[in-house]
Amino acid sequence: MASQVSQMPSSSPLSSNKDEMRPKADFQPSIWGDLFLNCPDKNIDAETEKRHQQLKEEVRKMIVAPMANSTQKLAFIDSVQRLGVSYHFTKEIEDELENIYHNNNDAENDLYTTSLRFRLLREHGFNVSCDVFNKFKDEQGNFKSSVTSDVRGLLELYQASYLRVHGEDILDEAISFTTNHLSLAVASLDYPLSEEVSHALKQSIRRGLPRVEARHYLSVYQDIESHNKVLLEFAKIDFNMVQLLHRKELSEISRWWKDLDFQRKLPYARDRVVEGYFWISGVYFEPQYSLGRKMLTKVIAMASIVDDTYDSYATYEELIPYTKAIERWDIKCIDELPEYMKPSYKALLDVYEEMEQLVAKHGRQYRVEYAKNAMIRLAQSYLVEARWTLQNYKPSFEEFKANALPTCGYAMLAITSFVGMGDIVTPETFKWAANDPKIIQASTIICRFMDDVAEHKFKHRREDDCSAIECYMEEYGVTAQEAYDVFNKHVESAWKDVNKEFLKPTEMPTEVLNRSLNLARVMDVLYREGDGYTYVGKAAKGGITSLLIEPVAL
């Protein structure tokens, strides 16, 4: 989350004789203004709620009803998931897939069915073997030329390949094979298959944000001739109901943010509370996580302010007491801070105090201590980076990586995301998370390395900041593009680790693991074409507009 800088004008309210030459990050103001300050003056009417409930029960019956073959069952479950309503039917879908896993009819398994079955089962943790794809290869070990004409089968194989783990060479080959042939075929396809293929080549199902993907698929699914009218109507109503809830949450958060008045008090910092909410709604969008969403959005907003304080304004001498104050976590420390640091320090403590009050009624105060400790570790790693910048120190790549991974904040966000969850989260969950398990490591690597490539490639970094890409280039004598390729390989490897951690038996319930999966997905969506959070790229603008502004036409 580093930035380009310019010199802060001496007329700035924060400048003084001592520090009038401080750098100031040249961030654009929020593009949303006060748009989300007020919630739309409407509620879901009783008739719509009744219809929603009626359709929900009809869809539930369809999921568990016998169908002519497993292909139909798999396709229906896939539609339920891709339309964003599977959270209503978790047990029913799990039971149906368990049955399919144990009762495979090989006669049905063309490329489409084999790939769809593989993807859905892997998504739900069933360790189905990638050997099921061997029958689509010839004696030379290449994919048969006959499958290239099966575009729908190729599309499903492409999507399935993103569930691969380490050692699954056939799926590594499948990514290249399907990408090549789908790219060649897309121009000659008819709608809506052409749209499915072109969208998939930009964003796979596995790495896309479920609600963003659901919004897109709603517009495609209704044009598929064989679509299920009951499911489509239910998904549209459900989308709008959840959107209204999200707008109410964002309105509440926007008022909190406006009251803090950081735009005036801390002009060096990013004003990205809307983008922060979009980020966190990617971590969990479902209605039952409303409390968690609001708490975690406030945390990411404050983490962004703290990051900018370390990275874009404060002197190293000021950061020492600031870090100590965060470590001590005591409002009495505020008197030891420079005047401009006091508002952010107080606001940080207030966010966690509110968090404690909200979870106290369920006896979950212990969770907030883990969240505080995660924030403290984040601040400590920021201080290390600040010291390196002050000393113009060039660490080795491994030394840089050891400190840079914590500074991306993903371990902190993962741990804090558990605070607002239900009884599925226990003290053991936090002990597990605090020990840096593989899935949190993997999502952190995805975050850090995608951020590093984006910052360097799109020149979103201060010249005096330590750059992971430049550390690597200098140490190994490679070009920038060669360094990008190495970092991208680390990202691909981390995705395989994420996938592996979902295969049963798992260390933690899927509901817990999903938080790290979704954090990784946010990076894939927001950072593939630059820092989409700081510089609010096309993905962020489009996602916020489609999820929070425009309802689905019924």
UniProtKB/Swiss-Prot annotation:
It catalyses: (2E,6E)-farnesyl diphosphate = (1S,8aR)-delta-cadinene + diphosphate. Residues 1-23 are annotated as: Disordered. Mg(2+) 2 binds at residues 307, 311. A motif (DDXXD motif) lies at residues 307-311. One of its GO terms (molecular function) is (+)-delta-cadinene synthase activity. Pathway: Secondary metabolite biosynthesis; terpenoid biosynthesis. Binds 3 Mg(2+) ions per subunit. It comes from the Eukaryota. GO terms for biological process: diterpenoid biosynthetic process; response to fungus. Its EC number is 4.2.3.13. This is (+)-delta-cadinene synthase isozyme XC14. It comes from Gossypium arboreum.
